Amino acid sequence: LIMGADKLKLGDIIFADIEENEYLNELFETILYSYSLKLFELDKTNQMKEFNLLDALRFADLLSKSTHPECSTVHKMWAQEIVILLNELYGDDPLVKLYASAVFTSTGNHQGLKIIDSDYQGLDMLERVFTQLRSDYLTIPAEPKMHFFSAQKEAYDHLSDPCFSYSVPTSMGKSFIMRMFIKDEIINGAQKNYALIVPTKALINEVSGKIIDDLADMLSSKNYRIVTAAGDIALEEDHNFVLVLTPERLLYLLISKPDLQINFLFIDEAHKLSGKNSRGPFYYKIVDMLMNRPQRPHFIFASPNIPNPQVYLRLLLDAFDNEDENVLAMTYSPVIQVKYLMD
C-alpha cells in the first residue's frame, strides 16, 4: 500500500485505531462481566453472557503483536489482560492455554508462561526459532534459569552507561534489575564498589537481605562485604563493598572516608530527589560530591512510573551529553489490575 511517498504497512492500518473497534470492546466488556460474576460467586444466580471465545483469543493474539509506534505497549498489556481473564474463566480449555502462551511469548512475559504452566515453543519452525532466540536474549546472565521481561532487559543493557535514568511500573522490579547487574559483575570478577541508595532505614534490611541471598557464598569467595552503616567495621578492612544506605548514611560515609572509591551509584526511588521531604538535600549533596571526584562513578537513577525520568540527568548535564539517549520511560507492566467501585 502506498500513501504519498511513504509506504503504508498492513500493521499501520490494523493497529491505527484497533482500541476503538466496537466488536473488540463488546467482547472485552462481556469477558469482564463474566469474570466479575465468577469472582463474586454470582455465576450460579446470574447467567453469563455468551460470546465467541475464538474471536476474543484471536484479538488478543493480534494485540500482542502490535507494532503501533505509540500504542504498542498499551495493546500488548490489553492482550495480556484478555488472556488472563479468559484463563480464569476457561483454564481447562486447551485453546485458551495455546493462545495465552502465544500472547505471553509475544510480549516476552516468561513469568506468565510459568503461571499457566506452559512450555509453548511456537506453531511453526520460524516461530519456534524466534521463540528460542527471544528466550536466549531475555535470559538473565547472573540467573540463567530466569528471564527478564523485555522492558527490564532494555534497562539492564544501559546500566553500564556513564549515566542512565529509567522509570518503570512498580511491578517491573527496578531494584531487581540493579541487583542482577551487580551480581553479574561480581561473578565475572569485578573488583568495584557499588553504592545503592534507598530512601528509608526500613528498606536497608530488605534490600541488603536480597543482595546477600543473591550473592551467597560469593561474598566471601570474591571478597565482598555488604555495608549498611557508615561505621561498619568491614570498611576498615581490605574488601570490595556493596553499600546499601540511606542518603544521610552515605553522605556521612563519603565525608568520613573521602578516599573510598565508588564505581556505581544506584539511586532507587529517585523521585525522592524532587519530592517534599527532608532527605532531598542529601541526595543532591552526594551527587555533587561524586561529580567533583577525579574518577566519577556511573550514575543510575531508578523511579517508579514517572513520565520524565530525564529530569534527574539534568543534575549531571555539565559532565555528560546526549541526555535523551540515557533515558528510558517504560509503561509496560506484566500484571493486570481489575478495579471495582463498590456502592
Predicted feature descriptions by range:
Residues 1-343:
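N-terminal helicase ATP-binding lobe
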